[in-house]
Amino acid sequence: MQTIDFEKFSQYSKPGPRYTSYPTAVEFKENFNEESLKTAFFNHDHLKNPMPLSLYTHLPFCRSACYFCACSVIYTSLEEKKVRYISYLKKELALLKNAMDTNREVVQFHYGGGTPTFFSPIQLDEITQSIQEVFPNFSQDIEMSCEIDPRHFTKEHMQTLFDRGFNRLSFGVQDFDFEVQKAIHRIQPFEMVQESVKLARDYGIKSINFDLIYGLPNQTKEGFLKTLEWVLKLDPDRLAVFNYAHVPWVKKTMRKIDETLLPSPRDKLEILEALISFLEKAHYQMIGMDHFAKSDNELYLALQKAELRRNFQGYTTKKFTQTIGIGVTSIGEGSDYYTQNYKDLHHYEKALDLGHLPVERGVALSQEDVLRKEVIMHMMSNLKLDYSKIEEKFSVDFKAHFKKELEKLKPYEEAGLLVFNPKGFEMTKTGGMLVRNMAMEFDAYLRGGEKHFSKTL
């Protein structure tokens, strides 16, 4: 990786989407409603070759707030809230069964949160069984994954997940430095994570991911490299290393972070450069903009073939799936739509009580949206683009259709961050750190100066 000129590189730090979707969630509107979703379900069920399903279930509860967290969570210690939520998940599942063909093949299954393991093992088993009864056609090689908070993870949880077929776990680690953990209100010693990982390995979990975050309060380059040394002792298969997005105008809990303790933009860049170098020496390869995987991992192998895809659950080797969002605030995705359930629990429950799918908003994609989505997702996943793949799928002349966008990429080429070739273009290793910036050049919705997004660096 080329040495970063921090003064020049800082010019690229500006608000921008992470592109877990295109159009981004900012463009979701309330005129996409229950009827819109039912129509989308019907259309997808009746495709010549219906795509497989990915099921995402949101389990929103946490016992206490982690100040850095941007997820949609509900803080509680009340058992009755969890029991009530399970009853409403069952109501939603019953409505989904009537609204779509739930016998289609399921290739991905994911629990996100919140803290999924804040639910008891018996409750998790009940939820999983309820979903499997409605969506019974699980693929033989299904990816079943769950987010794990090591502070709420027992042998009984692991046994339940194992019995239900889970084969991938993602542990929220963030940082092992105690001063950082204290500043973000999440204390979990190395030994706690070590014990959780050992438990997962003992049960034969084949894929273990760690979520790490750089840019947190009290973090330094030296301190984060020490965290990475501890990480290597636990030998995860994959790492997601996220850039902390400090958006206190969006997430109120972030207001509890002392902003004077946050690393400067230059410090964050130094941490990023150091962590990429450290992980590559440890034989973890960079995947997309924020993931790393071992050289023999399926993610890296798919990257070599430019076959990676990106969705709300991260990077995947699966071909395009229709994602069904279950639970409060969950997001669903099809080939030409996105939908999101109510973010407010009261409104979510009220819709279900009235017998309605709890759709709050969404967006139907135009053909131009679908085209640009394909371009952006290829860039975000593979850090390069082959024009012919887009031209064959959409019957367009790429250079003519995206003449203005390609012109906007020229400065990246001049800065040594992007290389054009006869087939398309490819980002350099350093340029890959700016994939969000380059993808933004193809975003037809950006208006400039918006505060909806975190900074790209």
Residue ranges: model-predicted function:
Residues 432-457:
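Short, amphipathic alpha-helical interaction segments positioned at domain boundaries
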Residues 1-53, 102:
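Flexible, acidic/Gly-rich N-terminal and inter-domain linker regions that tether
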Residues 397-411:
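Short amphipathic alpha-helical interaction segments
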Residues 413-423:
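A short, conserved structural fragment
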Residues 424-428:
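Minor-groove-contacting beta-hairpin "wing" of winged helix-turn-helix DNA-binding domains
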Residues 69, 374-376, 438:
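Short alpha-helical scaffolding segments that buttress acidic/His motifs in well-ordered protein cores
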